[in-house]
From Swiss-Prot:
It comes from Mycobacterium tuberculosis (strain ATCC 25618 / H37Rv). One of its GO terms (cellular component) is plasma membrane. Signal peptide: none annotated. This is Glutamate racemase. The active site is at 75 (proton donor/acceptor), 185 (proton donor/acceptor). Its EC number is 5.1.1.3.
Length: 271
């Protein structure tokens, strides 16, 4: 039986999942969090589904083995590649980023035309398209925006170059007259201002990060594992499988003073 004092485990292929960690911290400030950014193997978008599944489950094994009370797959590519395997494999709740965002988009749309942007792996997996299939009277337009992740990982989230890239990627969504757009990659909220500018103010952006954090709140409440308010102050541990210094520089933009330090993950621990 898991303890309410156990941490919530969160992982992503890099820094993008920190948008989810930030949202969880904002909504559940008392919770301990252990975050692993798989920068040594990411970004996952260009990888094959079997490669993504192998990397994601290795990190999931590590976090569950360390006693987390819930596992958050804070990566759309990993959610689409290994969610079923993870839920069969682990005896803790597994929260992913796709279905929470889909529910919010269906509730938000006014004309039934919904856009989804994500990595090539996420879009070609049809995970979002399949998740929307149960929603009546919706028309889905999905577009891969692979270079967005590269810009975010380099810390470039504004400027003419990335705006021009966004306008090119998003043009099919404008032609489809979508009124709701799912940011189907946890890196993309860092580009939300630029994406909103390109799409226009009448388009509602749905952040998978915010909706996933709400799902974590719901799940922990349902199984009575919320950390008590009178527990010791929350601790947050951030780890990277790649260069911790490079991770820290980028992560500070997501978390600010909440970040603290970033610890390296020895390759022998995740295999």
């Amino acid at each position: 039986m898991n303890s309410p004092l156990a941490p919530v485990g969160v992982f992503d292929s890099g820094v993008g999942g920190l948008t989810v960690a930030r949202a969880i911290i904002d909504q559940l400030p008392d919770e301990d969090i252990v975050y692993v950014g798989d920068t040594g193997n990411g970004p996952y978008g260009p990888l094959t589904i079997p490669e993504i599944r192998a990397h994601a489950l290795a990190i999931g094994d590590d976090l569950v083995g360390r006693g987390v009370k819930a596992l958050v797959i804070a990566c759309n590519s990993a959610s689409s590649a290994c969610l079923r395997d993870a839920r069969e494999r682990y005896q803790v709740p597994v929260v992913e980023v796709i279905l929470p965002a889909v529910r919010r988009a269906v509730a938000a749309t006014r004309n039934g035309r919904i856009g989804v942007i994500g990595t090539r792996a996420t879009i070609t997996s049809h995970a979002y398209q399949d998740a929307f299939a149960a929603a009546r009277d919706t028309e889905i337009t999905a577009v891969a925006c692979p270079r967005f992740v590269d810009f975010v990982e380099r810390g470039v989230t504004s400027g003419r170059q990335v705006l021009g890239l966004a306008q090119g990627y998003l043009e099919p969504l404008q032609r489809a007259e979508v009124d709701t757009l799912v940011l189907g990659c946890t890196h993309y909220p860092l580009l939300s201002g630029l994406i909103q500018l390109a799409m226009g103010e009448n388009v509602t952006l749905v952040s998978s990060a915010e909706e996933t954090a709400k799902e974590v709140v719901r799940v922990l409440t349902e199984i009575d594992l919320l950390r008590p308010h009178d527990a010791p102050p929350a601790t947050r541990i951030f780890e990277a499988t790649g260069d911790p210094e490079a991770f820290t520089k980028l992560a500070a933009r997501f978390l600010g003073p909440v970040l603290g330090g970033v610890q390296p993950v020895h390759p022998s621990r995740i295999h």
